[in-house]
Swiss-Prot record:
Domain of life: Eukaryota
InterPro entries: AA_transpt_TM
Transmembrane regions listed in the UniProt entry: 78-97, 104-124, 160-178, 190-210, 219-239, 288-308, 325-345, 367-387, 409-429, 432-452, 468-490
Keyword flag Glycoprotein: yes
Comment, domains: The extracellular C-terminal domain controls the voltage dependence for amino acid transports activity.
High-level lineage: Eukaryota, Metazoa, Chordata, Craniata, Vertebrata
Organism from which the protein derives: Gallus gallus
Protein's UniProt name: Sodium-coupled neutral amino acid symporter 2
Length: 501
């Protein structure tokens, strides 16, 4: 895309849009909009100086000004939005299915995808009525500084969660790659096989120098490369399902021992076949992580408005069609990845699917290629995620100040150090998916779009079907966030108590 700056904005009303209401104040915050990891589409700009903000034209009932016309085709917009949706969450979907069952997982996946689409609808309509294509600015117009802080904080948390999940992948996968290259069968205690040390090394040697750049020229390439990596990952997951036998050797050994010691009269085949029997409905202590993992996987909302801005022949209906195609494609991709991963390992799936293969296959050339591709993608993407967080902090604390290398470097080092501490001390990637999915993702999908819609869309009364639907959506978001967070914290407490014994 040739330009990231919008001067003024004019949207011709589509079928379901009417008059535009504008607040009485003008806002001109040069606030950058960047999606989360693997979710950015602006390769030729300085992220520190982006400005998607629209200048309000107060006093007119209809929001009419000049605007930068979109130049991105429908197909490329679908590709960009697919980039914004897909991410590391795909690695945790098989784990979610293993703890919900196939049928319950499909129901939850369908519900979350539909609700996410409804959220996109609310967000686009609110942007039209509120006269802004910036998520944080909608919060400012709706609720003042608290609204802006809520939007900015949610996006920052989501980005930190995404960044942590990518470094978790480095922590999990890089030791396995080194073991394969060095032909080491067992972990002999070498420091270079310790994931914590490797995360620190990668962060200091590769990620930090890239993060200190003022402009990331490779931004667009990273986004496309990451999507290709995930498609390749899906193909390998499907292929390996037909190659890995069930029952596995470990299942046969365990079944033999159990029958020999506990039930010598039992039919051994029943125990072995149970390990390869799919479940359709499962409820256990880990089931609570399914909804946060799914919401984490479908968060793309900070990228919706920038993609809408660049869409050729822009209209809300056309952007919703882009969303339908993208969400349907990602729905199929997520479903296939989760299903074939689950049908390969059943109840033995770990919270990061790629790591599960190493426990059963050891050194495998195809998996090694997948690991290298994924590691390269996440390493190049972490600096992309740091940019919007750093810009957000700069705008909140030092708005209007001239660029300072000292401030630029200090914020970068603090962010990267904080994320490394999380990755080293948080036990599993499941906890990152769960906590961020239940908090920031729930805010971005459920709570904020509905709250902005209720506040900014003035032409519809509160008793209208649209406003009632938005209010129910808001309440469901509160319920999802509080319920999942409560159950996750209780699971953490129970796990700590069990470990203490």
């Amino acid at each position: 895309m040739s330009s990231a700056e919008m001067g003024k904005f004019d949207i011709s009303p589509d079928e379901d849009s009417s008059s535009y209401s504008s607040n009485s104040n003008d806002f001109s915050y040069p606030y950058p909009t960047k999606p989360a990891a693997m979710k950015s589409h602006y390769a030729d700009m300085d992220p520190e100086n982006q400005n998607f903000l629209l200048d309000s034209n107060v006093g007119k009932k209809k929001y009419e000004t000049q605007y930068h016309p979109g130049t991105t085709s429908f197909g490329m917009s679908v590709f960009n939005l697919s980039n914004a949706i897909v991410g590391s969450g795909i690695l945790g979907l098989s784990y979610a299915m293993a703890n919900t069952g196939i049928a319950l997982f499909v129901i939850l996946l369908l519900v979350v995808s539909i609700l996410s689409l409804y959220s996109v609808h609310l967000l686009l309509k609110t942007a039209n009525e509120g006269g802004s294509l910036l998520y944080e600015q909608l919060g400012m117009k709706a609720f003042g500084m608290p609204g802006k802080l809520a939007a900015s904080g949610s996006i920052t948390m989501q980005n930190i969660g995404a960044m942590s999940s990518y470094l978790f992948i480095v922590k999990y996968e890089l030791p396995l790659v080194i073991k394969t290259f060095m032909n080491i069968e067992e972990n002999a205690g070498h420091w270079y096989l310790n994931g914590d040390y490797l995360v620190l090394l990668v962060s200091v040697i590769l990620i930090l120098p890239l993060s200190l750049l003022k402009n990331l020229g490779y931004l667009g390439y990273t986004s496309g490369f990451s999507l290709l990596c995930m498609v390749f990952f899906l193909i390998v997951v499907i292929w390996k399902m037909f190659q890995i036998p069930c029952p596995m050797e470990s299942d046969i050994i365990n079944a033999t021992l159990i029958n020999a010691t506990l039930a010598p009269f039992a039919d051994e085949n029943i125990t072995i076949s149970d390990a390869c029997k799919p479940e359709y409905f499962i409820f256990n202590s880990q089931t609570v992580y399914a909804v946060p993992i799914l919401t984490f996987s479908f968060v793309c909302h900070p990228a919706i408005l920038p993609i809408y801005e660049e869409l050729k022949s822009r209209s809300r209906k056309r952007m919703m069609n882009v969303s339908y195609v993208s969400f349907f494609a990602m729905f199929l991709m997520y479903l296939l990845a989760a299903l074939f991963g689950y049908l390969t390992f059943y109840g033995r799936v770990e919270s990061e699917l790629l790591h599960t293969y190493s426990a059963f296959l050891g050194a495998d050339i195809l998996l090694l290629i997948v690991r290298l591709a994924v590691l390269m993608a996440v390493t190049l993407t972490v600096p992309v995620v740091i940019f919007p967080i750093r810009s957000s902090v700069t705008q909140l604390l030092w708005a209007g100040k001239e660029f300072s290398w000292w401030r630029h470097c200090s914020i970068t080092v603090v962010l990267l150090a904080f994320t490394n501490v999380l990755v080293i001390f948080v036990p599993t990637i499941r906890d990152i998916f769960g906590f961020i999915g239940a908090s920031a993702a729930a805010m971005l999908i459920f709570i904020l779009p509905s709250a902005f819609y209720i506040k900014l869309v003035k032409k519809e009364p509160m008793k209208s079907v649209q406003k009632i639907g938005a209010a129910l959506f808001f309440l469901s978001g509160i319920l999802v966030m509080t319920g999942c967070m409560t159950l996750i914290i209780l699971d953490w407490i129970h796990t700590d108590a069990s470990d203490g014994h």
